[in-house]
A protein has these predicted regions:
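Short solvent-exposed coil/turn linkers within tandem alpha-helical repeat scaffolds
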Residues: 59-65, 96-102, 132-141
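Acidic, proline-/serine-/threonine-rich low-complexity intrinsically disordered segments
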Residues: 1-43, 48
Length: 154
């Protein structure tokens, strides 16, 4: 009788494993999980959004939404004024997605974060990089504005 229970349990476990594997590679499920995290962010539920984005990135690293999730994770920490963590999250985006359209935004926010931490030297260095590497973009314009504020001591 115990053999039957074990066999049934292993069949049940095998089905759970198969279903779990399907979820990991299911793009529709990935989108739904991403959307739930994003909705938490829109509702200003930042701690929950952070957890949801981290969970998403852990479970769906190859998803089309992964670079957005990584960027939002940086933004969430930035809004929460956790600038050191924000810098790390933006640097992760640069490392994992070096060709992303989000690179200029991530660099800009790294510069902003350094400025908020009072690290003017690194802030200026990063913001100048944004201006030079991404001329004519919104990120470059915002970097120039922040550089002007830094130079007058604001």
């Amino acid at each position: 009788e115990q053999g039957l229970i074990v066999e049934t349990d292993s069949e049940f476990i095998d089905k759970k494993v198969i279903n779990a594997e399907k979820k990991v590679f299911d793009p529709q499920n990935a989108e739904a999980v991403y959307q739930r995290a994003f909705n938490l962010l829109k509702k200003s539920q930042y701690d929950q959004a952070k957890k949801a984005f981290k969970n998403f990135l852990k479970n769906y690293p190859e998803s089309d939404f992964s670079e957005n999730a990584q960027d939002w994770l940086g933004d969430t920490n930035f809004v929460m004024q956790k600038y050191d963590i924000a810098i790390n999250e933006y640097q992760a985006l640069l490392s994992i997605f070096p060709n992303s359209k989000k690179v200029s935004h991530a660099l800009l926010k790294i510069g902003y974060s350094y400025a908020e931490l009072g690290n003017v030297s690194d802030a200026e260095k990063i913001l100048i990089e944004v201006v030079q590497e991404y001329p004519g973009t919104t990120a470059a314009r915002l970097a120039e504005e922040r550089l002007r504020k830094i130079s007058v001591g604001n």
